[in-house]
């Protein structure tokens, strides 16, 4: 990704984003700054920018981290703990903005376009982004949007990791009915997406990563997929993320794909105390010596 003249001017002129926010816990190596950006529909939305303490303006890797459904950007930022400071990278956690809803964007086209602008937004707030080392990491809806960002903007990313992602929005809509707040989620989905899967199947299809198997496979970008056989939110992960991994490998047998499974609760592994450090190490963002040991299985990508 190349930055234009206006962005370069902003990078030079803008100070590194201000002091550590009082709304965020004090960490030894990482500071958090609340910034704002203008979304695709013109609305101002917040984002949390995580930076190493004492960041001096040198080029730095950037992780784009979209949040899960109904979760705010600050809660998503807290999942990272002190890892950005320990690894020497930045993380931007945008609040997001869908077609109609903010915290339930579910892969809206405008939201994915906004995610692709996050390196420029971070740069405008004083971060000297190493454009060769931009990554996307998210869980649940954030994992869905990570995969869509990879499919639609493959040249932007040096790596992507999705934890327990939604991969089939048609299936998700009908499966919402089995959840405690399922009727509310279905109502929100109809508002955000524009109908039901029966009334507007294409609207659900274009928000589903499994619609973009060829693009994901041909992106030639390292991809990590994490999914649980005991997920009580996306209860059919073997038929969603598991199948997506198989299809990607089938489309490109040489795809740089890691496919892991276990028995954790929904997105429980996307946090600093669980699998997130291992995902970062695989992208060279965290030294292996700083990765806690933890036993989990790698699943061969063969069949469902």
Q: Locations of the language-model features?
A:
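Primarily recognizes the serine-hydrolase "nucleophile elbow" in alpha/beta-hydrolase
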Residues: 71, 125, 132-179
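Mobile cap/lid helix-loop segments that gate and shape the active-site cleft of serine hydrolases
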Residues: 70, 75, 171-215
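Short substrate-entry loop that stabilizes the transition state in hydrolases
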Residues: 55-60, 65-104
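C-terminal catalytic histidine-bearing segment of alpha/beta-hydrolase fold enzymes
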Residues: 224-226, 237-304
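Alpha/beta-hydrolase active-site loop
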Residues: 106-127
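Short, proline-enriched alpha-helix->beta-strand connector loops that line the catalytic pocket
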Residues: 216-223
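Acidic catalytic loop of the alpha/beta-hydrolase fold
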Residues: 229-235
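A domain-start/cap signature at the N-terminus of enzymes
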Residues: 17-60, 191, 288-304
């Amino acid at each position: 990704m190349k930055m234009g003249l206006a962005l370069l001017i902003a990078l030079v002129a803008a100070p590194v984003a201000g002091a550590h926010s009082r709304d965020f816990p004090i960490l030894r190596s990482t500071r958090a700054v609340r910034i704002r950006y203008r979304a695709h529909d013109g609305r101002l939305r917040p984002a949390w920018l995580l930076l190493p303490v004492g960041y001096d303006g040198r080029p730095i890797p950037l992780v784009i981290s979209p949040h899960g459904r109904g979760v705010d950007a600050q809660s998503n930022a807290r999942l990272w703990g002190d890892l950005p400071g320990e690894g020497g990278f930045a993380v931007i956690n945008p609040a997001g903005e869908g077609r109609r809803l903010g915290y339930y964007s579910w892969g809206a086209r405008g939201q994915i376009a906004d995610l692709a602008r996050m390196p420029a937004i971070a740069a405008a707030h004083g971060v000297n982004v190493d454009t060769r080392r931009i990554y996307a990491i998210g869980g649940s809806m954030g994992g869905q949007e990570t995969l869509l960002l990879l499919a639609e903007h493959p040249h932007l990313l040096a790596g992507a990791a999705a934890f327990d992602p939604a991969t089939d929005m048609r299936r998700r809509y009908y499966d919402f009915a089995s959840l405690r707040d399922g009727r509310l989620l279905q109502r929100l989905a109809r508002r955000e997406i524009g109908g039901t899967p029966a009334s507007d199947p294409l609207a659900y299809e274009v928000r589903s990563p499994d619609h973009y198997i060829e693009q994901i496979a041909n992106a030639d970008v390292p991809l990590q997929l994490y999914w649980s056989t005991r997920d009580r939110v996306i209860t059919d992960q073997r038929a969603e993320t598991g199948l997506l991994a198989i299809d990607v490998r089938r489309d490109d047998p040489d795809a740089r794909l890691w496919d892991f499974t276990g028995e954790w609760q929904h997105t429980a592994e996307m946090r600093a105390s669980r699998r997130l450090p291992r995902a970062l190490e695989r992208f060279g963002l965290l030294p292996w010596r700083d990765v806690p040991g933890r036993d989990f299985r790698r699943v061969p990508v063969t069949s469902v």
